[in-house]
């Protein structure tokens, strides 16, 4: 749910234009330990978080865009893919202390699977022959870094790989996202957040999930690394974060639950109440449903007079994995908490800023709780130096992902997958074509942003 905020805001603005497993390669980066300070003080220096592990780059070359995006038109068209499945919630009655003990037993995430010359020589056959083990390892480790494979350096080889593994593509949970256009629609491949206007925006850890819909798996592929540096892909184990977090903070968050606001619309506070309620009702009925999220429109939940926020329903920050039953940290607070976003590189305008609240009082998370989420999360980040052909397979109910800032041009892409072995969990919905027009319209709007757009929301 990384950019529900911008996409919802873009749609709102069209309606109300006149309103305003490998060895650690480096120790935990010092930049991650910068202290959080009070939000009422002067704006803080923006510092990109660090990581617990930072493997070295290898300097592998890839293909040109004309080559890596050249789809094989003789293959079946996958554009009528499955709808993203509904979120599998199983969060009641979790013993937090016991859950932390269980989580500590999990192996390091991600597992690195590095291609040898012999493995590369097999091409697609390697994945066909090793399908069972790779799928089992994905469940065990939460993510697998397929490193140095020649096969996945273009869209056709990438598709060969995930089809050999038996993965079944589905839509992004927020298909109407203005920052999620297709790289190759007929291959069910979305472009990742490569837009020049957002290269200076740090994307925090999150699952590709809303309270309503969650993809079961993902495969992130690098076709072109950032030409002028940066752009590491970050991943962390939800089990490791759960085990790491202070037990009292974790229990507090679990007991109180959280709610996430995904958009701000600032209405002049002096407007009469009936006008403000009319705006609220219009947004609720005409715009929010297009995003296939369960949202409530609430005024001034963050204390700002006149601010209308679109807020998701209450959700538990801990959820049991649908297949293994393992309780894991399953929420997007590291990405969406305002107190964290205000202190790192952020390319989101004020209207698109998110916030995380305690569900029982609708108060923003405290500075202390945000600091603990930051510490526990960033200690377990692996910042991957993904190069052409590299793929990160992700169990979306176990591992969280994000992206560091970068310079120059970069091209990563992603395919999302539904439950291929459980028809009930997958559901019977196919692609909702009505979403596509909104998707394209908002993409066009987002392309208007300057290449180095930077927010000034602090």
Each language-model region and where it sits:
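Non-heme Fe(II) oxygenase catalytic core, chiefly the N-lobe of the double-stranded beta-helix
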Residues: 43-141, 148-387, 400-424, 429-457
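N-terminal mitochondrial targeting presequences
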Residues: 21-22, 26-41, 45
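N-terminal chloroplast transit peptides
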Residues: 2-27
């Amino acid at each position: 749910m990384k950019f529900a905020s911008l996409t919802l805001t873009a749609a709102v603005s069209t309606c109300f234009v006149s309103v305003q497993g490998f060895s650690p390669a480096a120790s935990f980066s010092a930049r991650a330990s910068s202290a959080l300070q009070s939000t009422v003080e002067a704006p803080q220096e923006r510092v990109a978080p660090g990581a617990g592990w930072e493997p070295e780059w290898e300097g592998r070359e890839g293909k040109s865009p004309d080559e890596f995006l050249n789809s094989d038109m003789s293959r079946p068209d996958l554009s009528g893919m499955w709808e993203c499945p509904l979120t599998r919630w199983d969060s009641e009655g979790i013993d937090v202390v016991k859950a932390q003990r269980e989580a500590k037993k999990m192996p390091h995430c991600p597992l690195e699977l590095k291609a040898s010359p012999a493995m590369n020589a097999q091409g697609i056959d390697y994945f066909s022959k090793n399908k069972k083990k790779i799928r089992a390892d994905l469940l065990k480790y939460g993510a697998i870094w397929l490193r140095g494979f020649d096969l996945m350096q273009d869209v056709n080889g990438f598709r060969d790989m995930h089809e050999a593994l038996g993965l079944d593509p589905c839509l992004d949970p927020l298909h109407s996202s203005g920052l999620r256009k297709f790289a190759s629609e007929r291959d069910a491949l979305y472009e990742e957040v490569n837009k020049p206007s957002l290269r200076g925006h740090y994307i925090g850890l999150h699952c590709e999930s809303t309270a309503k819909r969650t993809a079961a798996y993902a495969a992130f592929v690098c076709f072109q690394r950032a030409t002028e540096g940066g752009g590491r892909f970050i991943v962390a184990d939800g089990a490791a974060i759960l085990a790491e977090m202070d037990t009292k903070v974790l229990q507090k968050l679990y007991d109180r639950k959280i709610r996430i606001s995904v958009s701000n619309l600032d209405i002049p506070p002096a407007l009469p109440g009936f006008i403000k309620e009319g705006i609220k009702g219009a947004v609720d009925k005409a715009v929010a449903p297009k995003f296939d999220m369960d949202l409530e429109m609430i005024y001034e939940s963050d204390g700002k007079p006149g601010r209308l926020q679109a807020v998701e329903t209450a959700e538990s920050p801990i959820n049991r994995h649908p297949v293994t039953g393992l309780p894991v940290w399953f929420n997007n607070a590291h990405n969406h908490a305002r107190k964290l976003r205000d202190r790192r590189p952020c390319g989101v305008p004020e209207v698109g800023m998110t916030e995380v609240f305690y569900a029982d009082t609708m108060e923003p998370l405290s500075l202390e709780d945000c600091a603990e989420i930051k510490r526990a999360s960033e200690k377990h980040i692996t910042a991957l130096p993904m190069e052409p052909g590299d793929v990160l397979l992700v169990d979306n109910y176990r591992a969280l992902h994000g992206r560091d800032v970068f310079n120059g041009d970069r091209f990563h892409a992603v395919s999302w997958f539904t439950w291929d072995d459980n028809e009930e969990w997958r559901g019977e919905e196919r692609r909702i074509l009505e979403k596509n027009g909104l998707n394209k319209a908002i993409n066009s709007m987002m392309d208007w942003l300057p290449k180095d757009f930077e927010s000034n929301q602090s």
